[in-house]
A protein has these predicted regions:
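AMP-binding/adenylate-forming catalytic core of the ANL superfamily
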Residues: 4-5, 12-15, 109, 121-122, ...
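Glycine-centered tight turns that cap/initiate beta-strands
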Residues: 37, 61, 97, 192-195, ...
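Adenylate-forming AMP-binding core of the ANL superfamily, especially NRPS adenylation
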Residues: 47, 86-132, 140
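Acidic/polar alpha-helix N-cap and adjacent early helical turns
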Residues: 267-274
Length: 274
C-alpha cells in the first residue's frame, strides 16, 4: 500500500491471497494510503472468493481484471470488474482463439448451467502443449485442439465461465462427490483464517474425508477446530464441510499463489492401508 501511494502505481499483478491479507488490515491502516492512482490490478493464479473480490472492488474501485489460463496456452478467459459485478463468481468469457465447452464424464457436451468438465476449443488447432511431456499434452485433449486445464465448471446463459473445482482435487466420500473449493471459499472469509487448503485424506469407512489445512492469523491463535467447522456448516451444506481441521504454518504457495495439493495429500496416503 505504501508503494502504491508513494509511487502512484497504475497497474500491478496480484493473487487472491494478497487481497485477503490487505482486507485483514485495520480500516484505519488502509485509509492512510491513497490508492486512487490504480487503473488495473490483474489477478490470477487461484480462485477468488466472491465476498473478498466484492470488498476489494468497493475499496479500490472497478480496477480489478481477472485472467484465467495457463503458462502453456496463455489467457483463455478474462473478466473486468464491471462484467464481474453482473456475473459474480465468474472468470469471464472465453477469449479468442478459444471457445469454452462443458463436457460430462462420458465426453458429451452439456447444456448451459450444467456442471461438468471445462474444455477449450483452440480455433488455431494447437491446443495445449506441455514442454517435453507429450503424454500429458495428449491426455489433456478430448479431440485435436480441444483441451482441458483440469477444471470443473459451467457456463451461464451469457457464456460466462464459472469454475467450481479441479478434477484431481475432487474428494469422493461414501460415493458422494465433494469439491474442496466450496469449503475453502467459506473458511477464507472467517476473520481468523489467513489461508486454507482442503484435501481428501483416507477414511476406512467412507474411502475419503475432507480435511482443511488452516493458517490462522496472528490474532486468531485461539480459534478452534470446532468453531471453524461450525462456521462452515452455518454457510454450507454439512456434507460439503471438512470433517477435520489441522492448523499449520505454511501451505507452500508459489509466487503465483498456487498450491501443490498432491504434495499436501501425500503424507496422509503414504502409509494408509485401506
Amino acid at each position: 500500500l505504501s508503494a502504491i501511494s508513494d509511487y502512484e502505481i497504475e497497474s500491478t499483478v496480484m493473487v487472491p491471497t494478497h487481497f485477503v491479507r490487505l482486507l485483514d488490515l485495520p480500516k484505519g491502516v488502509r485509509d492512510k494510503y491513497d490508492v486512487s492512482s490504480l487503473k488495473m490490478v490483474t489477478h490470477t493464479g487461484a480462485a477468488c472468493p466472491i465476498e473478498i473480490k466484492q470488498n476489494m472492488i468497493e475499496w479500490w474501485g472497478p480496477v480489478l481484471f481477472e485472467a484465467y489460463g495457463a503458462s502453456e496456452v496463455g489467457t483463455t478467459c478474462s473478466i473486468t470488474s464491471e462484467e464481474w459485478l453482473e456475473h459474480p463468481g465468474s472468470v469471464g468469457q472465453a477469449r479468442p482463439p478459444f471457445e469454452a465447452i462443458i463436457f460430462d464424464d462420458d465426453g458429451s457436451p452439456v447444456e448451459r448451467g450444467v456442471e461438468g468438465r471445462l474444455y477449450f476449443r483452440d480455433k488455431t488447432g494447437r491446443g495445449v502443449v506441455y514442454h517435453n511431456d507429450p503424454e500429458k499434452s495428449a491426455a489433456a485433449h478430448i479431440e485435436p485442439g480441444v483441451f482441458t486445464l483440469g477444471e470443473i465448471g459451467y457456463l451461464d446463459e451469457d457464456g460466462y465461465v464459472y469454475i467450481t473445482d479441479r478434477f484431481s482435487d475432487m474428494v469422493v466420500s461414501g460415493g458422494v462427490n465433494i469439491y474442496p473449493a466450496e469449503s475453502e471459499q467459506v473458511l477464507i472469509t472467517h476473520e481468523n483464517v489467513l489461508d486454507v487448503a482442503c484435501i481428501g485424506v483416507p477414511d476406512k469407512g467412507m474411502g475419503e474425508k475432507l480435511l482443511a489445512l488452516v493458517i490462522r492469523d496472528s490474532s486468531g491463535v485461539s480459534v478452534t477446530e470446532e468453531q471453524l467447522i461450525s462456521y462452515c456448516r452455518d454457510n454450507l451444506t454439512h456434507y460439503k464441510c471438512p470433517k477435520k481441521i489441522e492448523f499449520i504454518s505454511d501451505l507452500g504457495r508459489t509466487t503465483m499463489g498456487k498450491i501443490n495439493k498432491r504434495k499436501l495429500r501425500a503424507p496422509y496416503w503414504e502409509n494408509f492401508q485401506g
